[in-house]
């Protein structure tokens, strides 16, 4: 399936890299590359991962180290929604994401 990465997931990966880079810039680069590689693996066989109905319809997740890769499975695309540290309140973060106001339409 085609792989898509949400803007929020891109921000998550950047924040993870920035955090790791404070102590180890080389590892930060290699770890963020590993996260992207994991996303590619998910896109190859998305249905083997755990369903997460409490997060939304067609949502699944995959652990990678201490991080949780949360993604949706669409007709022709696997969309990475968030990459979050496992200690975070995943349900609350998804509720906030769903409650975010839609941007206004362009004139």
Over which residues does each language-model region extend?
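Arg/Lys-rich, positively charged N-terminal/basic patches that mediate binding to nucleic acids
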Residues: 1-32
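Short, hydrophobic secondary-structure boundary micro-motifs
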Residues: 29-30, 50-52, 92
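Enriched for short, Lys/Arg-rich terminal
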Residues: 67, 72-107
């Amino acid at each position: 399936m085609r792989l898509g990465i949400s803007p929020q997931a891109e921000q998550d990966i950047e924040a993870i890299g920035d955090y790791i880079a404070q102590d180890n810039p080389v590892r930060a680069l290699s770890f963020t590359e590993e996260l992207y590689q994991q996303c590619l693996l998910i896109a190859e066989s998305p249905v083997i991962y755990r369903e997460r109905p409490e997060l939304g319809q067609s949502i699944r997740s995959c652990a990678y180290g201490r991080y949780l890769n949360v993604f949706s499975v669409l007709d022709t695309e696997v969309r990475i929604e968030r990459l979050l540290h496992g200690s975070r309140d995943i349900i609350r973060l998804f509720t906030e994401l769903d409650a975010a106001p839609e941007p206004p339409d362009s004139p």
